[in-house]
Amino acid sequence: MFAHPFDHSFNDLFNQYVNMDTSSTDANKDVSFPSEFDQLFPLDSFSTDCGDQSPVISTVQHNSQPAQDWGKDLWSLSQNTGCSTNQDSFSFQDSTQPSTALDLSIGLEADATGHSQASVPRSTPSTPPATPGPKVKGGLFTPKTIRHHRESNDRRGLLRKQSFSPGLMRSSQLQKGSCRMAYPEAWAQRLQNFTIRSSDECLPLSPPPSDILVQQENVKHTPVQMRNAAEGFQGSTELPQQIDSGYITQSPAIPMPSPSANALAGQQQRYLSQTGTSALTPSPPSARDVFSSPHSSDPQSMPSWHSESLNTPAFQYTPELSDHQTWWSPMPSEVAQRHASYQQMIASPAPQRPVQAAANHGDFLQGGLMIQLDPTQFDISSSFPSSTIPTTANNHDNLAYNVEAHAPQKYVDASSFNTQAVPHPSRSPSISPKADTSPRHGSANRDGMAMKNAPRRPHGRKLSGQSTSTPKPVKTPNSLSTSPRGGKSVTVSFVNFTANDRQKILTGVAPSGSSKTKARREQEARDRRRKLSEAALQAVRKAGGDVEALEAVLC
């Protein structure tokens, strides 16, 4: 047909390869090719190393085929090799089968893998018939167990002596062409089956790691085919992740962190330059001390640190650290500028810088909880600000870093003046004359609060003290309410747990109850008994019974 020029070179190469294969593969040794074939295929071993690379039916049918199917495949394949040794009877009668098989295999390979399986026509035109033969046979040398291995050797030795007819050779040629045509599809099946069975098999027996070893040693065209097969299946969702994760694209994953490390180093340099020019306070060193990351401040140590670790999730934390710093840094800078102007208005600017540093450090460490603030010292110093202005400035700084100035001052001052004025009323006249020396609105408000709160609390305490004392006519709602009910409980106002009240408490009533409840219960019991007896007497009297006998029983 149209491919006559390829026939002779194809037949010569194929016959040389089959002769070498039948003489050398009996003892499971590596195939050594002649020089012309070595120039086309620079491979060292097909039977042992490339056995795992075979695209064919062996690994696809591991789970489903019994041992008899292994024998059938082996019979057809060993007829390939055995029949081709007889070169006298080996002749193509119409000389169309290898060329058409070659063209059909190229077309079907292109259809099977899309536009990406271009590795077969990229090499010389005689390469496809030679590659699948040893790959098919080598795939049978590496099953999971040694039993298939020995059966394959024995059956090849027996079947090599059988028929050498050209008809069988032609059918085996067509079978070799069909095996070559099924090459990319079988590769996809092998990859999927490997990912399915990877939990059951050990890694040295599985196909793809041995493929990586053969790629790294001496194979030139097979990585191109593998890469094209991987590109052909990019449409599916799970297969690119499986291919990229382990065993095909492992070499470009190693130098990948270097550009990201350089970009991070550039980001760190930009961030350090921005923070060095913008921030006026020493807040960024304290923040770095809090976060304990000294290597992030050094831009030269960034690429070496990332290249040693080679862990991609570790790269995501240092930008977050810098983002946290940039998120926190505007707030102390604005507050520092605002309080710088505030301190220049009130006091001398000499203690301004250490006060801001201490306030910044406290703000970063405590998260705005105002733990360092002492309310008693703050109230005493603010009540006479003419003598100690810098301490009031410090306390105002600590207040205004987290909340607005006026509302918490009123709250804190009210509570502190309550605690000072109530337990020790003798201090209030000593504080108030000093506060009159400086007419400020804050001190005036505090004095007003102290004047309102100070007489109120001792009055309530006097009321509570009078309640424990002897009864007086001012206090009498409790005693007046109990006095008309029971005659016994008139003098008792409240149960005090003393030695004198022991008999009152422990007379059938719970110790926590008062004598009022005891008297009320006794009165209710007496009334109930009286009503019951009266009703019984009336019923007996209506019935015409003996009323006197019933009264004697009831009384």
From Swiss-Prot:
InterPro entries xref list: WetA
Similarity comment text for this entry: Belongs to the wetA family.
Record GO biological process: asexual spore wall assembly; conidium formation; pigment biosynthetic process; positive regulation of conidium formation; positive regulation of transcription by RNA polymerase II; regulation of transcription by RNA polymerase II
Deletion phenotype: Prevents the formation of normal conidiophores.
Stretch forming the signal peptide: none
Keywords: Activator, Conidiation, Sporulation, Transcription, Transcription regulation
Free-text comment on this protein's domains from its UniProt entry: Has an acidic N-terminus (AA 1-52) followed by a Ser-, Thr-, Pro-rich domain (AA 125-233) and a basic C-terminus (AA 461-555).
Keyword Transcription regulation: yes
Biased composition (Polar residues): 162-171, 259-281, 293-310, 419-431, 464-488
Name listed for the protein in its UniProt record: Developmental regulatory protein wetA
Task performed by this protein: BrlA, abaA and wetA are pivotal regulators of conidiophore development and conidium maturation. They act individually and together to regulate their own expression and that of numerous other sporulation-specific genes. Responsible for activating a set of genes whose products make up the final two conidial wall layers or direct their assembly and, through this activity, is responsible for acquisition of spore dormancy.
Region (Disordered): 113-171, 250-310, 419-488, 508-531
Record-annotated membrane-spanning stretches: none
Induction of the gene: Expression is induced during conidiation, after conidia had begun to form. Positively regulated by abaA. Negatively regulated by velC.
Source organism of this protein record: Emericella nidulans (strain FGSC A4 / ATCC 38163 / CBS 112.46 / NRRL 194 / M139) (Aspergillus nidulans)
Gene: wetA
